[in-house]
Amino acid sequence: MKKIYTFIVAACMMMLAVSCQNEQAVTEAVSEEPQINTTMEDLLTRRSIRQYTDEMPPMEVIEEICKAGTYAATGMNRQSPIIIAVTNREMRDRMSRLNAQVMGNDNDPFYGAPVVLVVLADKNVHTHVEDGSLVMGNLMLAAHAKGLGSCWIHRAKEVFESEEGKQILAELGIEGDYVGVGNCILGYVAGDYPEAKPRKDNWVYWVK
């Protein structure tokens, strides 16, 4: 009788172990799927935002977004871009003024956003524009994933080719042959989040 009891206990323990392993496998599979779905959702729901509140996002959030930018793909992993993360109001307004001068008006080209992430890249690397553009994409997607709005603002190239733009780089201690790729503005969205416009019909040409 004692042997039968021992056998039953051992069998129950084996069944419990198998059940736990199966449950863990199911849990891992379920936990992986939402992550994939969330990534796709972020890709499909990100929008360019042109209306912001004055509220400054937490520094740790900005740092995480910058980190995402550093993981963008670059040609032969040369990592030619750099990011200037501007949260200082005086510098932000200075860059806004320079950008507006290039644009030819007095409006704020940063749409009131409190944060500007300037992406530059080493022009001696032949993939510098592509590298910097991928960084910009990562920054905007990461901002959306963190609940912030973003927008790619052009004219970084012209700003940092100007004498004052070069002076800013010198003041920041940045040396090298860097060319501006883009300004990623960040902040909390003011007003309604914009809806996506319809996609054009001839986006993809299949070759099967």
Protein language model features and the residues they cover:
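Bacterial N-terminal signal peptides
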Residues: 8-16
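Acidic, surface-exposed loops and disordered segments
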Residues: 5, 18-208
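Bacterial N-terminal signal peptides that target proteins for export
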Residues: 1-8
